[in-house]
Amino acid sequence: MISTAIQQLVNYGLDTGLILPDDEIYIRNQLLMTMQLDDFTAPESEVCYTDLESILKTLVDDAVARGVCEDNSTARDLFDTKLMGVLTPRPSIVRANFEERYENEGPQAATDWFYKFSQDTDYIRRYRIKRDLKWVTKTAYGDLDITINLSKPEKDPKAIAAAKLAPQSAYPKCQLCAENEGYAGRMNHPARENHRIIPLTINDSAWNLQYSPYVYYNEHCIVFNSQHTPMKIERATFRKLLDFVGLFPHYFVGSNADLPIVGGSILSHDHFQGGLYEFAMAKAPIEKVWTFPGFEDVEAGIVHWPMSCIRLTCADDERLVELADKILTAWRGYSDESCFIFAETDGEPHNTITPIARMRDGKYQLDLVLRNNITTTEHPLGVFHPHAKLHHIKKENIGLIEVMGLAVLPSRLKKEMAELADALVQRVPTAQYPEELQKHAAWAEDILARHPELNADNVHPILQDEIGHVFAEVLTDAGVYKLDEAGRAGFARFLASVK
């Protein structure tokens, strides 16, 4: 009975604290209105609920059956978000709760509450996040995190067709804009009625804090400019990053680079990503200590990491900003033909930085990862980008998250790895592989040559381990200075050029 499901959702709101007992009748009536129902029959006995996903499915199935909601994956997501939006407190209440906890209990208590809240509202869909495949691979650079992302919804054919027919809109300008808060969504833009953001001031400018709905790692947050302004790595970027970790010292925060290929998927809206997680790069030791003249008070060095990373640590955050700006300025204009590093070609700039900030033992710390997006006929997607032989696993941009040591791999790999596992166990000749596995053929032959012991019992851990080592190669390809004698000498030449 649909009245039972409505009461279950009301009870869920009460149990999670999204609504208060005084709100019960009002919220129930708002849910009835959203469902386009006029009647409610109170359940005869106390209503218990199993899980939120089941409650929402019952309600959406009913709405679809009555023609209130279209029957495709996107329309269903739009509708169940509308239902959760009824339970979600208004922004002013959420912000007041956050600020009260921040002032009285501290920054971690505030983010703990906001992270749970963002899950309770179903903005972060816990039941989808659980579907992601995750494991750790031990490498020469530490333990790399690998995930095959299954929680980001893939549109079904009906939803894709509907999105093509949907009228185009420039509001909100992108999925990061503050105007998404409370937005109902459409076939080509996700619903955000259950989405709330926390205003922040960093570097005397208006920014906001939210969580990523896809949670690639613990407390994966997004910090974004209140204005729809493009990504730009500059002196002010370092100031903003350090201001943020000053406000939330338990979180790290970093920025994608500001150039295509080496940047993230969204270059049009200035934003950072952070969270409560320690990546392999953060754990990596200093390989070579370096002292910058005039900055003897700043601990500096090259990190033992496949991507070219300079680590700076100092109790005085302004000194870090000053030195980081010098390094950025030097790198923007730096060329070294022997390492195939060119600051620009045909007027197109190539050099930039992926910066990450954190607090370490009471001091401020910046990791500056040197990036270059030059392309050639041999490497049309980028010289310092995963090379073609690795594209069967990872072809996409190497953004901030990958730079730090977490591979976010496409969902297609789940099915392909299951099929490849069967083919490997049965020793199927690669020439007989189906078309979708052909891209893995050379890799599969190499795996079998190195793992003659491969069988049905160990094939899956072996494949996971091999994927992890491919990711280590991906990071090596993306590093501008290789971890060999020539690369190390080239890195030292650049550091010596910073004045």
Regions found by a protein language model. Name each.
Residues 1-223, 227-230, 304-306, 320-324, ...:
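Active-site microenvironments that recognize anionic phosphate/pyrophosphate groups
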